[in-house]
Amino acid sequence: YTGLTFDYAVTYLDAQYDKFTQGACYFGRTPTNATERTCDLSGETLPNAPEWRTNLGVQYEHALASGTGFFRTDWTYTSEQNSDTGLDPRAEQDAYNLWSARLGWRNGRYSVSLWGENLTDETVITAAGQQTVFGGIDGGMQFFLNEPRTYGVTMEVRF
């Protein structure tokens, strides 16, 4: 079909520490080096390193009398991962899907589009870290999350 474009990508990642004996210990994990209070993370999966990630995008463009109409949608799947450098189980992120879409019109000078990101309103841990208080007492976890469902209109004028 004229004006129809597909793009697809797959990533497989097997990322592990070969040797990392000075890793951070999460609260409740017994340090392997009691003097330095570090843990041996050798053989563990790296943080923020999902085994699988795949993207699929579809775009359709159609010539109109006054410009070009277009529609685009993107889908991303990411397998489970841990977002904490010490691999704290509280920072485990389950596999998730993200979906976005855009509908618009453009010509050489003007464009307008209606768009939406994270349309399924998926909550994803993007980073995490332990919070400790005096004496190494567990103060809980601090989580950073992705943006919730967002949508809007974008208008452009090119000079």
Language model features with spans:
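Residue-level preference for alpha-helix termini and adjacent loops
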Residues: Q16, D40, T45, E51, ...
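Residues that define the transmembrane beta-barrel architecture of outer-membrane proteins
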Residues: P50-T54, A95-W99, E147-Y151
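Short, basic/aromatic-rich helical patch in the C-terminal catalytic core of site-specific tyrosine
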Residues: A101-L103
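Outer-membrane beta-barrel proteins
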Residues: P89-Q93
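C-terminal beta-signal and adjacent terminal beta-strands/loops
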Residues: T2, T76-D84, W105-F159
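Gram-negative outer-membrane beta-barrel transporters
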Residues: Y1-G86, T154-R158
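Generic structural signal for short, flexible, solvent-exposed coil/loop and linker residues
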Residues: T35, G43, T85-D88, W99, ...
